[in-house]
């Protein structure tokens, strides 16, 4: 891998293009091993008011080596822009980190993000000095609007959170990628390493994965597999794919081929 091919977000550069979530692991030890196997440098954690005081949540931040990872608090569970802004400020006060994965999700069934609320919250939070990474549906117009208000990335979903269905709308994700002036991080719904490779092949700058690794039979092995998928996809994108054709094209030239005479047919 070209060590000069870095992912730059909010003025910071990273050699890994795989971001990881920290939820759904059976214990902290498995989570730590998976993070290590993935090579990730950015990890996201849900920080809500109730979780900061709830038994079982204590220790998550202690389990993360914050000298090794860029912490990315998120507003998972927030249903309105106003709630997301409040939780973002709480997260910054609790962690000292201004990076934020912005999630505004009013829909409890399909967990699809609210574009209007996300844009409104993003504008407020950027003005408050946050480095905002908004989670959105794949919409090129919305992506440009989020970029215009100062978001550090745009994070279009591949498919609904936790479904593992992969890239269901690659054409729409391409509209987000095309013309983007900030990194595009495909998030949610990736199920297998080939999904990550496909996202990077399309031109996405990175992917964020959680459930596909945490719920794998062997999370550590799956974390490594996703790292390889991301690397393969990025290399394939940089190498430039062949032109697609409607008709077949032989890989070996026909010129110079020795042709035998047709066998005689008995009378």
Swiss-Prot record:
The active site is at residue 101. The keyword Protease does not apply. 1-deoxy-D-xylulose 5-phosphate binds at residues 162, 188-189, 210-211. Its main location: cytoplasm. It catalyses: [ThiS sulfur-carrier protein]-C-terminal-Gly-aminoethanethioate + 2-iminoacetate + 1-deoxy-D-xylulose 5-phosphate = [ThiS sulfur-carrier protein]-C-terminal Gly-Gly + 2-[(2R,5Z)-2-carboxy-4-methylthiazol-5(2H)-ylidene]ethyl phosphate + 2 H2O + H(+). Keywords: Cytoplasm, Schiff base, Thiamine biosynthesis, Transferase. GO terms for biological process: thiamine biosynthetic process; thiamine diphosphate biosynthetic process. It comes from the Bacteria. Residues 243-267 are annotated as: Disordered. Pathway: Cofactor biosynthesis; thiamine diphosphate biosynthesis. It is an enzyme of class 2 (transferase). Homotetramer. Forms heterodimers with either ThiH or ThiS. This is Thiazole synthase.
């Amino acid at each position: 891998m070209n060590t000069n091919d870095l992912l730059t977000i909010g003025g910071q550069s990273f050699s890994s293009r795989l971001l990881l979530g920290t939820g759904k692991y059976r214990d902290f030890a498995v989570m730590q091993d998976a993070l290590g196997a993935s090579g990730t440098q950015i990890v996201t954690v849900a920080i809500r008011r109730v979780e900061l005081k709830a038994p079982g949540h204590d220790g998550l931040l202690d389990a993360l080596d914050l000298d090794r990872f860029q912490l990315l608090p998120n507003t998972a569970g927030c249903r309105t822009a106003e709630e997301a802004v409040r939780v973002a400020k709480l997260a910054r006060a609790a962690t000292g980190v201004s990076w934020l994965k912005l999630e505004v999700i009013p829909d409890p069934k399909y967990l699809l993000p609210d574009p209007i609320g996300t844009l409104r919250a993003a504008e407020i939070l950027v003005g408050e000095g946050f480095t905002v990474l908004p989670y959105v549906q794949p919409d090129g117009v919305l992506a440009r609007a989020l970029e215009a208000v100062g978001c550090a990335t745009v994070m279009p979903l591949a498919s609904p959170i936790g479904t593992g269905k992969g890239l269901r709308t690659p054409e729409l994700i391409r509209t987000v990628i095309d013309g983007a002036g900030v990194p595009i991080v495909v998030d949610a719904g990736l199920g297998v390493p080939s999904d990550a490779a496909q996202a990077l092949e399309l031109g996405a700058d990175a992917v964020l994965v959680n459930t596909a690794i945490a719920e794998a039979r062997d999370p550590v092995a799956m974390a490594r597999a996703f790292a390889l998928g991301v690397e393969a996809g990025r290399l394939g994108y940089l190498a430039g794919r062949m032109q697609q054709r409607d008709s077949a094209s032989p890989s070996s030239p026909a010129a110079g081929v020795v042709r035998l005479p047709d066998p005689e047919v008995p009378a």
